[in-house]
């Protein structure tokens, strides 16, 4: 299957290159704490040199995908912990970094945001979080692990929305992932399909024909290994109509049965988009999980 034509790819890359400086400057201004009149600036500051593109290509069979992302370097020295954020449906990777990049300051860790295939400025199609999303997450982890400024044993993965599905499938397949945050995801597509509202079904049909085989391949619960030695934080809104709370509760139970250390944070009045509430819960989890060497991503 032809994913992208050469002319389209070159045009998009040219546009991305022309706008790269502006995007990095915009992200840097947010991280600098630049504010309006009468507001107190942030006590700590990052220059634009701390924000760099984190883009790469990943191949799956005959298809090749270009992955868009950004990396925010913490001002700390040495090999630091890191968090990889798998973004999907919450804007592009630049917006992800604007929202979460400040963790480089507040937690003293490296922050990488990528858009999984089919989202943001990453090439697609997504095909309902197909195998290409997991392949992109695998490669991103390997790239981070190879960096001299990252402790390869202290890397966490944080998936948001459909990115949580990709993160969960990565957890199913890669025993190196020791700490994972799953936010607002749908983890049992086999059960979700008959319960999903018409709008959600139409969105799924637009991406892929939802046969039982396809739904099982993309269901985190259906692909869980017999045992898991990882820490998992599940964050979810009780009023989420795109991914019902029962999806998160069912996954939490399945993970505990397999030996995972699971904690949950459910917001009774929240829907699919959790905003600052999710960042606060995730920050607490990351601080504890990556505080000491030897936790996060096994070598």
Name each model-derived stretch:
Residues 106-123:
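Conserved alpha/beta-hydrolase
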Residues 41-76:
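N-terminal cap/lid segment of alpha/beta-hydrolase-fold proteins
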Residues 228, 234-236, 240:
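Short beta-strand/loop motif that positions the catalytic acidic residue
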Residues 143-149, 153-196:
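Primarily recognizes the serine-hydrolase "nucleophile elbow" in alpha/beta-hydrolase
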